Amino acid sequence: MSAVQPVNPKPFLNSLTGKFVVCKLKWGMEYKGVLVAVDSYMNLQLAHAEEYIDGNSQGNLGEILIRCNNVLYVGGVDGENETSA
């Protein structure tokens, strides 16, 4: 069995800048888009964002800002092309 390795969040988020990510909020919604920027509080700016509720797309939102205290997790999305935003 392999153990989960701890990751320092700031370098991890900075490494995802310019790539497609999925961000799940504490309230159950998910947002997929290109991570444009992360600040020192770990607020997220996404471009080409799409909202998902219960796995169903609710539509395209464009550019959004997600406040840090709402985020449950952030991860890279495999199979998506990198985009300069």
Swiss-Prot record:
Q: Where in the cell is it found?
A: Nucleus; Cytoplasm, Cytosol
Transmembrane domains' residue ranges:
none
Q: Which Gene3D superfamilies match?
A: 2.30.30.100
GO-annotated biological processes: mRNA splicing, via spliceosome
| Name of a matching Pfam family | LSM
| InterPro entries tied to this protein | Lsm6/sSmF, LSM_dom_sf, Sm, Sm_dom_euk/arc, Sm_F
For the keyword Coiled coil, the answer is no
Q: Name one GO molecular function term.
A: RNA binding
Q: Where is the signal peptide?
A: none
Listed name of the protein: Probable small nuclear ribonucleoprotein F
Q: Which organism is it from?
A: Caenorhabditis elegans
The protein's role, per its UniProt record: Plays a role in pre-mRNA splicing as a core component of the spliceosomal U1, U2, U4 and U5 small nuclear ribonucleoproteins (snRNPs), the building blocks of the spliceosome.
Against PROSITE patterns, the record matches this protein to:
SM (PS52002)
PANTHER family cross-referenced by the UniProt entry: SMALL NUCLEAR RIBONUCLEOPROTEIN F (PTHR11021:SF0), SMALL NUCLEAR RIBONUCLEOPROTEIN F SNRNP-F (PTHR11021)
Question: Which terms are listed as keywords in the entry?
Answer: Cytoplasm, mRNA processing, mRNA splicing, Nucleus, Ribonucleoprotein, RNA-binding, Spliceosome
Q: Which GO terms describe its cellular component?
A: catalytic step 2 spliceosome; cytosol; pICln-Sm protein complex; U1 snRNP
The UniProt record lists the Sm domain at 8-80
Please tell me whether the keyword Ribonucleoprotein is annotated for this protein: yes
What family name appears in the similarity comment?
Belongs to the snRNP Sm proteins family. SmF/LSm6 subfamily.
